[in-house]
Amino acid sequence: MTRCEFFTENDRINGFSISGHSDFDEPGKDIVCAAISAVVTMAEATINDVCGAKDKVRVKDGENNRITLTLPASCDEEDSVQAVLTGMMLTLCSLRDDYPDNIEVLEV
């Protein structure tokens, strides 16, 4: 199962951590994993390249692949960044509703 954690405080999303594999199908054929990857990649690229927010991204490869993004305490494009992260969370929640055995979404 893929675990999607959103770090929130005072109605602000401070970052996220996505780990694991959805196990919907074998790697390379897993549409749930592909959808999650596309959503995460879009959010990370938008925050970095379009919004110009200076964030910290760590990617760890291995059996429990993980990507973690942590925002600074404030950024110039705060409203845009929060809109991107909220859209990401809503999209992942929609996937969770369709594939509850393969993805979980948590606010921590």
Please name every model-derived segment.
Residues 1-31, 41, 45-108:
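N-terminal intrinsically disordered, cationic/polar leader segments
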Residues 32-36:
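Short, conserved glycine- and acidic-residue-centered signature motifs
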